[in-house]
A protein has these predicted regions:
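Conserved structural motif at the start of ABC-family nucleotide-binding domains
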Residues: 6, 23-27
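The feature captures the beta-strand-to-loop junction immediately N-terminal to the Walker
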Residues: 41-43
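Helix-to-loop junction immediately C-terminal to a conserved catalytic motif
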Residues: 56
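Conserved ABC transporter NBD signature motif
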Residues: 64-72
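Conserved ABC ATPase "signature" region
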Residues: 105, 120-138
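Conserved ABC ATPase signature
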Residues: 142-146, 150
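Catalytic Walker B motif of ABC-type/P-loop ATPase nucleotide-binding domains
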Residues: 167-171
Length: 312
């Protein structure tokens, strides 16, 4: 059974001002386990980055507790915290004249002392971290020559080289194409299992998070933070109500979202297999509701002819 690495009790986050305090979210109670990938979802401006910065100790909390490995986060020194939490940010780093191995080696900074000289053990950790994310072939490449996906893997390798039990990532798939997004999410899930680390990330890639994450945090201004597995949040209606808006419908059977088209007409559609599915999709995209049980004068057969019907 995975152990609880992070414990959050009645957490309040936001920004203190001169005359008042802006509370972004409060009353957050949760635990984040080792060996799990947890994804934070929410609309722009809801406070995902504020929550992530607070959990990372980049900004102070307004109230409540954040405990990492049983210890209140505020009792850690900066040096101690650098051996507990590693963070991968969204911003692209414009690095020139630095190789992949050298950048990953910076993850050893909490252990190398003032001069930053890597020991053989440090070099072994760097090499192992590069191997874990599957980029040994990039080890001697210059960072500025890498693609966005390659660069993100390097930053994850750097976080692994830091050897912390907790890794936070701020929208790690933000600049990636779809195949790279899938690969990145699968990699992070695999790493959480293989290394038994606590990996927590914010993302806008809803569909991928629902298919890959172990736990989901849904954050909105009305309800604060709702937490559960994708399956639990589907069964209790949290996902459907969280994203309820015109044009979007949550399908509880697949656990995914689909576009809810407005229909001007309908046809009875016969057939089976992929041809039937693609024809139904094409018709519905064009405002025509189609299905086997639809009662309509127009009948379309996708894989043959029927009396009074059309062959497609």
């Amino acid at each position: 059974m995975n152990s609880e690495t992070i414990h959050i009790e009645n957490l309040s986050i936001g920004y203190p001002g001169k005359n008042d305090v802006k509370v972004v979210a409060d009353g957050i109670c949760a635990g984040i386990n080792s060996g799990e990938l947890t994804c934070l979802l929410g609309a722009n401006g809801v406070g995902k980055s504020t929550l992530l910065r607070t959990l990372s100790a980049f900004q102070p909390k307004l109230g409540g507790e954040i405990r990492i490995q049983g210890r209140e986060i505020e009792t850690y020194t900066d040096k101690q915290l650098s051996r507990v939490i590693s963070v991968v940010l969204t911003e692209k780093c414009d690095l020139r004249n630095m190789s992949v191995t050298e950048l990953v080696g910076l993850g050893r900074t909490p252990y190398t002392g003032f001069w930053g000289v890597l020991t053989q053990e440090d070099k072994h950790v760097v090499e192992h971290s590069i191997a874990l994310v599957g980029i040994p072939h990039l080890a001697h490449r210059m960072v500025h020559t890498l693609s966005d996906g390659e660069r993100q893997k390097v930053m994850i390798a750097k976080a692994l080289a830091q050897e912390t039990p907790v890794i936070y990532l701020d929208e790690p798939t933000a600049f990636l194409d779809f195949p790279s997004k899938v690969e990145m999410m699968q990699l992070l899930h695999h790493l959480s299992r293989r290394t038994d680390k606590t990996i927590f990330l914010s993302t806008h890639d809803l569909e991928l998070a629902l298919q890959i994450a172990d736990k989901i945090w849904l954050m909105d201004k009305a309800n604060g933070v709702t937490i559960g597995t994708p399956e639990d949040l589907s069964l209790n209606g949290s996902l459907g109500s969280f994203f309820a808006r015109k044009g979007i419908v949550f399908d509880p059977e697949s656990g995914l979202f689909r576009v809810d088209n407005e229909y001007a007409s309908q046809v009875r559609l016969s057939g089976s297999g992929q041809r039937y599915a693609m024809m139904r999709k094409a018709l519905q995209r064009n405002g025509i509701f189609a299905g086997r049980d639809v009662e309509a004068e127009t009948h379309v057969e996708t894989d043959g002819c029927t009396e009074g019907g059309d062959k497609v």
